[in-house]
Regions:
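Short E/K-rich amphipathic alpha-helical oligomerization segments
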Residues: 20-57
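Short, flexible coil/linker elements and helix-boundary hinge sites characteristic
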Residues: 39-40, 78, 84, 88
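Intrinsically disordered, low-complexity repeat segments enriched in small/polar residues
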Residues: 17, 32-35, 68, 80
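Amphipathic alpha-helical coiled-coil segments
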Residues: 21-22, 48-80
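Short acidic DE-rich linear segments
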Residues: 1-3, 83-92
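Intrinsically disordered, low-complexity regulatory regions of eukaryotic regulatory proteins
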Residues: 6, 19, 43, 89-90
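Intrinsically disordered, low-complexity regions enriched in serine, threonine, proline
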Residues: 7-9, 27-30, 43, 60, ...
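Short, charge/polar-rich alpha-helical segments
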Residues: 1-26
Length: 92
């Protein structure tokens, strides 16, 4: 039981960490788009920024997936915790 609660706390921390990473990525995307708005960019620099933007978009999508999976694990963990509580209370 205590292990399940400790596991849930670790998941909460992982979600917070990934959300912080995602916030940084969103900021980098905004900065990259601002740079791309400059019409006087050299074509090589523009291509490089477009590649960076594509990578940032993919990184953000991966963080969203990770957050979603961690939340699924938390829901499952809660269900198991509730099940164990009910199971142990019936034994007593």
């Amino acid at each position: 039981m205590e292990q399940l609660l400790a596991y849930e706390e670790r998941l909460r921390q992982k979600i917070a960490d990934v959300e912080a990473e995602k916030a940084q990525i969103v900021l980098q995307k905004r900065e990259t788009r601002d740079k791309l708005a400059n019409e006087s960019l050299h074509p090589v620099e523009r291509a490089s920024l477009n590649e960076l933007l594509a990578a940032l978009i993919k990184a953000e999508e991966l963080r969203d997936t990770l957050i979603s999976r961690y939340r699924e694990f938390m829901r499952y963990n809660r269900l198991m915790t509730e099940h164990n509580i009910r199971h142990h209370s019936h034994e007593e």
